[in-house]
UniProtKB/Swiss-Prot annotation:
Coiled-coil ranges (or none): none
Pathway membership, UniProt: Amino-acid biosynthesis; L-histidine biosynthesis; L-histidine from 5-phospho-alpha-D-ribose 1-diphosphate: step 5/9
GO cellular component: cytoplasm
Protein name: Imidazole glycerol phosphate synthase subunit HisF
Annotated source species: Chlorobaculum tepidum (strain ATCC 49652 / DSM 12025 / NBRC 103806 / TLS)
GO molecular function: imidazoleglycerol-phosphate synthase activity; lyase activity
Function field: IGPS catalyzes the conversion of PRFAR and glutamine to IGP, AICAR and glutamate. The HisF subunit catalyzes the cyclization activity that produces IGP and AICAR from PRFAR using the ammonia provided by the HisH subunit.
Taxonomy, superkingdom: Bacteria
Catalytic activity of the protein: 5-[(5-phospho-1-deoxy-D-ribulos-1-ylimino)methylamino]-1-(5-phospho-beta-D-ribosyl)imidazole-4-carboxamide + L-glutamine = D-erythro-1-(imidazol-4-yl)glycerol 3-phosphate + 5-amino-1-(5-phospho-beta-D-ribosyl)imidazole-4-carboxamide + L-glutamate + H(+)
Subunit note: Heterodimer of HisH and HisF.
GO biological process: L-histidine biosynthetic process
Annotated EC: 4.3.2.10
Family per similarity comment: Belongs to the HisA/HisF family.
């Protein structure tokens, strides 16, 4: 069985790591480089760097910060925010990214997924899907969750897979920052019907939530921010807990 991955996420704005609730009310969560070094030493499996206001402000990701982070970590680095063209993806790779995460641009121009995958390989393309429950339906949102789209989550997940995405980063906007647990309903709906890895995101508040994301949600990886940024738990604690409960992890 493939090992399940634990992935901390650096939501970056104005040169700092931040964390909010339901994509709103951001608070400072520390220095980008200090957090990156910490997670590298903590045995995180990967690290995600998301410039959370880049797409909203129609600008490119802060590549200078990406370069600094890539020089400090020796684990796979995914970079997202403002990746709106093959050229911007290329720039991210030149600055040390191992994968790029596309979200808003993928919805407005789905062929971008295929173009990046054709040039750099599917393994380098993560499609981030931000979902919110609206009248009982899971609707995909873009622009840092500000704009609803015409897509339902499962439909969009299948489409991005067909277009060449190598992985899906699925974030529940309803659960984001609440620490109430992942939305395992939509997680399972997508994880069990696509054949590419799905990363659970949005809502991790304790180690049981990580476990349930794997067992109930069938996720391949669990992304978390608040519980790690504010040192509620360490990555090692999380992995030891999961291993004790029968989940295969790298230690």
């Amino acid at each position: 069985m493939l090992a399940k991955r634990i992935i901390p996420c650096l939501d970056v704005r104005d040169g700092r790591v931040v964390k909010g609730i339901n994509f709103e009310g951001l608070r400072d969560a520390g220095s980008i480089l200090e957090q990156a070094r910490f997670y590298n030493n903590e045995m995180a499996d990967e690290l995600v760097f998301l410039d959370i206001s880049a797409s909203l402000e129609s600008r490119r990701t802060t590549l200078e910060e990406v370069l600094k982070v890539s020089g400090e970590v020796f684990i796979p680095l995914t970079v997202g925010g403002g990746i709106s063209s093959v050229e911007r993806a290329h720039d991210a790779f030149l600055h040390g990214a191992d994968k790029v995460s596309v979200n808003t641009a993928a919805v407005s121009e789905p062929e971008l997924i295929s173009r990046i995958a054709e040039k750099f390989g599917s393994q380098a393309v993560v499609v981030a899907i931000d979902v919110k429950k609206v009248d009982g339906r899971y609707i995909v949102h873009t622009h840092s969750g500000k704009k609803p789209t015409e897509y339902e989550a499962v439909e969009w997940a299948h489409k991005v897979q067909e277009l060449g995405a190598g992985e899906i980063l699925l974030t529940s906007m309803d659960r984001d920052g609440t620490q109430e647990g992942y939305d395992n309903e939509i997680l399972k709906m997508i994880s069990t019907t696509v054949h590419i890895p799905v990363i659970a995101s949005g809502g991790a508040g304790n180690l049981e939530h990580l476990y349930r994301g794997f067992t109930d949600g069938h996720a391949d990886a669990a992304l978390a921010a608040s519980i790690f940024h504010f040192r509620t738990y360490s990555i090692r604690q999380a992995k030891e807990y999961l291993r004790e409960r029968g989940i295969t992890v790298r230690l």
